[in-house]
């Protein structure tokens, strides 16, 4: 089977990393500050909460040109007698005649996507404000069998899911009146490898969600795949059969639990994307292949196609410049890598590592427990003991824990290069004060709540 990999291997190979960026741990979408917009969604109107049954919901995601809107049209014209409501960002994008919509018995709500940052205790979530209002309103009408939400091509699925589970100040939540049933992502079989390899920022294509949206196309594609229950591998008629298998197995490695369905023109049985009961938030959060690898769950069946993975663990910090050399020179066969890292120059802060195709980001993940004052540790003895389980040696829980997924990877060689990027025995002996003076070309980390000029190196 490896012989069949050759022709498509270059398309999946990310080539040299083209984008090395700093990214805040929670930065996934453009965010709005907590203002009057947040106060406006502090509670759901009582009349909206008066519903006899929960409204099941399917969310459609997919990059521009994947066939997501075609899937929506297929659902609307083959709804098998159900009374369906639809929420879309732009009516013009559906391109269905208004008379046909009326004949189909479909109610379409146009609600431009609007993000708002909400706080619940110490947890901060970015939610879809438009959905908080519209879904509750539709559910309160008690006349629909199903709701389909078509997200924009640059949307990530997780904020939608968080919108359903988030409890507002009065204790109400969308999940009280509607149930998130299925998260569907449509993938262009021909374009996926190419876009994954690119490091184009959405902003460079005029697609940014707003000021400060530094995501790349590759970041977005991976986010859409990793949080899906059902993935339509679309436009397979435009790709050689062997290459379709290769793309499917790559997606399977990124999200082992998703059901992958091959389609042409997004044609699929209604029951495969509606009423599946597949969505579970906790399961979805654990679905990404990199996280399953860290948890010891391997996906060996993809290895015959040259798709493999390995975990790198170490208990000494990276030298920033040697790590930078690895990132820009040695990751051409790596399609996805994720985890946390320890940089010698930023000894007290955990680094969050995320790479998708040709895009690499690194940002702060909070202080290591070993660098956290005892007063800020968990008060519960069992929780504190759990924290200490990660401690080893003089540097506590500081460590490298990274998962690499790629095609044609030489794991042994990559491990060797990563090991060479760690501090030497002599450098380790010099201690943290000496490490702080090492050259460090990585972008500075803007810590949570810090102002410009208060970055951490």
Mark where each language-model region is.
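N-terminal, immediately post-signal peptide pro-regions of secreted/luminal proteins
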Residues: 22-33
């Amino acid at each position: 089977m490896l012989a069949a990999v050759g022709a498509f291997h270059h398309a999946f190979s990310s080539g040299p990393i083209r984008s090395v960026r700093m990214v805040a741990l929670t930065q996934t979408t453009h965010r709005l500050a907590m203002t009057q917009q947040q106060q406006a969604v502090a509670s759901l109107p009582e009349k909206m909460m008066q519903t006899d049954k929960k409204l099941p919901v399917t969310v459609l995601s997919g990059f521009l040109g994947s066939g997501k809107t075609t899937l929506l049209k297929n659902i609307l014209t083959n709804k098998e007698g159900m009374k369906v409501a639809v929420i879309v960002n732009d009516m013009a994008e559906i391109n269905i005649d208004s008379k046909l919509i009326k004949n189909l018995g479909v109610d379409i709500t146009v609600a431009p996507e609007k993000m708002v940052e909400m706080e619940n205790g110490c947890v901060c979530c970015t939610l879809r404000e438009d959905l908080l209002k519209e879904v509750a309103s539709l559910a309160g009408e008690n006349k629909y069998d199903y709701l389909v939400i078509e997200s924009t091509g640059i949307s990530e699925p997780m904020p939608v899911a968080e919108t359903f589970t988030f409890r507002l100040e009065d204790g109400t939540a969308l999940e009280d009146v509607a149930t998130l049933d299925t998260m569907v992502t449509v993938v262009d079989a021909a374009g996926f490898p190419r876009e994954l390899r690119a490091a184009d920022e959405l902003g460079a294509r005029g697609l940014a969600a707003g000021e400060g949206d530094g995501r790349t196309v590759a970041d977005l594609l991976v986010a859409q795949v990793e949080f899906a229950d059902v993935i339509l591998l679309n436009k397979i008629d435009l790709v050689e059969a062997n290459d379709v298998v290769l793309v499917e197995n790559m997606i399977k490695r990124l999200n082992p639990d998703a059901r992958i369905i091959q389609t042409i023109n997004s044609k699929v049985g209604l029951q495969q994307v509606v009423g599946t009961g597949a969505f579970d938030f906790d399961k979805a959060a654990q679905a990404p292949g990199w996280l399953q690898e860290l948890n010891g769950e391997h996906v060996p069946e993809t290895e015959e196609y040259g798709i493999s993975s390995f975990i790198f663990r170490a208990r000494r910090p990276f030298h920033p410049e040697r790590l930078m050399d690895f990132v820009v020179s040695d990751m051409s066969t790596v399609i996805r890598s994720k985890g946390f890292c320890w940089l010698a120059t930023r000894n007290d802060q955990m680094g969050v590592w995320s790479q998708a195709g040709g895009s690499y980001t690194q940002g702060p993940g909070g202080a290591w427990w070993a660098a956290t004052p005892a007063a800020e540790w968990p008060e519960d003895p069992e929780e504190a003991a759990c924290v200490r389980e990660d401690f080893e040696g003089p540097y506590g829980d500081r460590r490298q824990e990274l998962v690499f997924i790629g095609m044609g990877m030489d794991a042994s060689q990559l491990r060797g290069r990563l090991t060479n990027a760690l501090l030497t025995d002599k450098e380790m002996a010099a201690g943290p004060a000496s490490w702080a003076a090492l050259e460090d070309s990585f972008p500075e980390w803007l810590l949570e709540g810090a102002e410009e000029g208060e970055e951490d190196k």
